[in-house]
Every structure is written in C-alpha cells, then in structure tokens.
C-alpha cells in the first residue's frame, strides 16, 4: 500500500465513524483494574476484542498469565512480514481506572464514548484503548 493509499484509508476509517464505533465498543468493556474482581473483564477484553481483531490482521497472539497476582493478563501479538522491513513495536494496556459512573455529568457514561465539541469522553479514550485503536487502524 502506498503512503497516499494509507492516508486515504485512515481518513475514510475516521470520517465514516468506523473509528468511533470501534473505540466505543472497546470503551464498553469495564476493565477497571483498581477494583477487586476485575480480572475476568480484563481477560474478556483480550479474548473477545483484541485477539480476534489482531488475528484478523495476521497477528499471532498469546495471552500470558501475569506473574503479579494483582495484575491482569499480558497479551503478546506478533506479525512477521519480511526480514527487509523494519520492526515496529507498540505497547498498550486495556485496563482503566474505576468508572465512577455517578460522577459523570450531562447523562454521560464512562462506558460509552461521548463527543462534545472536539472532545471525546469515555474511560480509555486516551489511555489506552484509544491508542490501541489508532495504532492498529
């Protein structure tokens, strides 16, 4: 894919609301790592969202149990194309801080992306589900 084709594809992805829809789906996972019992939702985020998405893009994915008992699982995804191409590495996390649903204003929810002017609200929109969505777009 040429540079121009790549820029056109990402522009189309963003302007068609596909980016919003994908990010909104990811924000919908209540991956609150600072609350007890969050491990199942963190695992579900990887199993149901990230692994299928990355696999569809040609990545091989392995989920490892975190050696820390108080931390979520670790996903390692790899896609090899050619020795002549550069290595690209990205890091991210799927957990967010507690949603504090009752503290959100104007009928907003931490578990849905809300656009207000040029600002997008929702747990994980900037840290770190937004990064996943941008990096792999």
Give the ranges of each region predicted by the language model.
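Acidic/His- and Gly-rich active-site-bordering loop/insert found
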Residues: 2-125, 132
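Active-site-proximal alpha-helical scaffold in enzymes
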Residues: 131-137
